[in-house]
């Protein structure tokens, strides 16, 4: 699957325990997206365009109205990246 660098960075953050919080307007349409890492930092690579691409490819999903998390398909699409945490 062809995944861009911002999509790859977002998926990697989600695979390590992050989440995507969304904000909706009065018509229940998504107006803002925030990708929060496991450590609580905000990932700037995750914007509305990246979010829509990941959702349309079904690499992320939301359960019971909660934050968006990575799916099994998303985990399979993530390329391994070295982890500098020791």
Curated annotation (Swiss-Prot):
Pfam families, per database record: YjhX_toxin
InterPro entries to which the protein is assigned, alphabetical: YjhX_toxin
Family designation: Belongs to the UPF0386 family.
Entry protein name: UPF0386 protein RC1_1783
Organism from which the protein derives: Rhodospirillum centenum (strain ATCC 51521 / SW)
């Amino acid at each position: 699957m062809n995944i861009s660098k911002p999509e790859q960075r977002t998926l990697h953050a989600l695979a390590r325990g992050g989440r995507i919080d969304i904000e909706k307007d009065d018509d229940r349409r998504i107006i803002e997206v925030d990708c929060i890492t496991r450590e609580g930092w905000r990932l700037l690579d995750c914007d509305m365009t990246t979010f829509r691409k990941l959702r349309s490819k079904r690499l992320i999903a939301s359960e019971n109205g909660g934050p968006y998390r990575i799916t099994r398909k998303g985990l399979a699409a993530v390329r391994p990246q070295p982890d500098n945490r020791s």
